[in-house]
Amino acid sequence: RKKTQNDYARFFDEWHERDLSDLILRDRNHPSILMWSIGNEVLEQWSSAEADTLTLEQANLILNAGHDASTLAKDGELSVQSLLTQHLAEIVRRYDSSRPITAGCNEPNPGNHLFKSGALDIIGFNYHHEWVPGVPQNFPGKPFIFSESVSALQTRGYYMMPSDTVYKAPKEWWLPYTDPTYMCSAYDNMHASWSSTHEETWDVVKHTPYVGGQYIWTGFDYIGEPTPYGFPARSSYFGIIDLAGFPKDTYYMYQSEWTAKPMLHLFPHWNWLPGQTIDLWAYYNQADEVELFINGKSQGARRKITQKEPSLLCTEYHVGWRVMYEPGEVKAVSRKGGKTVCEQTIKTAGTPHHIRLTTDYQGKETTFVAVEVVDQDGNLCPWAEDQIFFTVDGDAEIIGTDNGCQTSMENFKAPQRKAFFGKCMVVVKGNGTLKAQSPMLKTGELRIKR
């Protein structure tokens, strides 16, 4: 069934078998393939005529696909949508019987036509974690995953307080949502109308034995789907990494849960208005507690909790403090058994002074260079928006720039980029010297050699 006027449904009858077969044959020897999905949020989950219907050609294709008499009697009790699901699964198994088959379903009811087909080896829910407790009864013996999850909304470097208020944007999917900033909170406290926060979904995955895992929507921001905004927003807010490749804060929540290496991530920055009430969060692992200091004065030690206490900004996944801002420095210290595990200090940044260039990633041909506007002591200036101009020598070539801003209309191929919350990224191909210049800042320079 078509979702849009010019989508793949126009070609399905003629091309689906060849395209699906070619997909399996192309990728079946890749060890990274865990399972095959035969659909994502397809309209065939439902029988409602409100969402279009199968064409006569599609129905004939399935009902006359070589079933013998004994099979037709059994299949005749199923809907055309269920038979189509079986047909697609048969194509997959024809070329690869070693991997299970699933589908991303945003209809969690067991009456879903895809589920009714019996062709899915793994039940996949897109969102709807409130239905998870019923999975063992509704799908006995079937493995289960979140085939798509979370859809939290975040802009790197932007924070909406109080942080324990959860914002749903829009409140319902059909309602408009407006905010003059066109930004979303980088605390894990904002999500779309159909979804949840990162912590909320991960809590279900972590504590439900029969949930096999989750696919987070999304790892990276991407062009398009700028929920909850319209123009001038032109890229998504869903990623735990922004479009330029910079991690958002929630990236470190997963790091704290999924890695054994000790880590500590304190946020946000420490450049606010005098007397402003600020919520500070910390993600950590391999420690019992984290203590916060403001200009050397302890604000108390916090530890993760499993039961919500209204007086504390703490959960099972982060700790927090509500404090009054004063310029200087904040320091977090994580401890285990009374011994320090990790420390992190954030200082109030002064006037933007120079451009710092560091190699973020170096591949076979390209180098990703992180560009930061810093004060004279090297502290990131979190509100900096300077326009930065790039030049290279040697055989080097600038092939891309970005800053992670969802509303930026700057050309991705242009040799300049405006800093966004103090940062941007430039991608260089080849060897040479990269220079970054801005009228009010000391030039940054980096020699790239591979």
Briefly describe each language-model feature range.
Residues R1-Y325, E329-K339:
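Extended substrate-binding grooves/exosites of carbohydrate-active enzymes
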Residues N271-Q276, Y361-T367:
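Short, solvent-exposed loop/linker segments at the N-terminal edge
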Residues L280-Y284, V333-S334, E365-P382, L434-A436:
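Beta-strand-rich structural segments
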Residues N285-R303, Q344, Q376-T407:
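Short flexible loop/turn segments that cap and initiate beta-strands
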Residues K308-G320, T407-M425:
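Aromatic sugar-binding surface patches on proteins
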Residues Y325-E329, T366, N431-T433:
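Extracellular Ig-like/FN3 beta-sandwich strand-entry sites
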Residues K339-G350, K442-R450:
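Edge beta-strands of extracellular beta-sandwich domains
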Residues I346-K364:
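Low-complexity, Pro/Ser/Thr- and charge-rich linker/hinge segments at domain boundaries
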